[in-house]
């Protein structure tokens, strides 16, 4: 009976891990550096931001760039000093680089956005239980949740 119970628990554990597993997607670029410039609106719990990503393609012909961008409204995207076409799906920002680039190129995209993060960035402000609490925001996004605010 103990063997059956242990086996069932092991199988249940394996099944629960598989449901939450999201494999690392293949990437088309190597991001070298990011400059993050944000303003935090504590009262509305929003982030108004501009992020610059400097990157190099990993292939010989890369003409678009997809980045995770959940809980964001993208306002503008530029490659160098030129606005480029983009669209958003529910969880990603898709950018058309206007031509193909290769691993010998180093590019910078600048993205202006507003975010209302559900996770990754947390807001604390006074409430009825803690009326003297100071306004504060802190991050705990690591690699999986930062795309909700940056």
Model-derived segments and spans:
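Acidic/His-enriched low-complexity segments
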Residues: 14-150
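Sec-dependent N-terminal signal peptides
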Residues: 4-12
């Amino acid at each position: 009976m103990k063997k059956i119970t242990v086996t069932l628990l092991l199988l249940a554990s394996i099944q629960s891990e598989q449901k939450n597993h999201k494999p690392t997607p293949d990437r088309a670029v190597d991001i070298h550096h990011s400059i993050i410039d944000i303003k935090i609106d504590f009262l509305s719990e929003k982030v108004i931001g501009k992020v610059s990503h400097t990157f190099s393609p990993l292939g010989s012909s890369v003409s678009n760039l997809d980045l995770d961008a959940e809980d964001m409204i993208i306002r503008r995207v530029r490659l160098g000093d030129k606005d480029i076409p983009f669209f958003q799906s529910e969880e990603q920002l898709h950018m058309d680089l206007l031509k193909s680039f290769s691993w010998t190129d180093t590019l910078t995209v600048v993205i202006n956005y507003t975010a209302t993060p559900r996770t990754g960035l947390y807001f604390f402000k006074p409430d009825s239980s803690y009326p003297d609490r100071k306004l504060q925001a802190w991050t705990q996004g690591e690699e999986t949740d930062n795309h909700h605010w940056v």
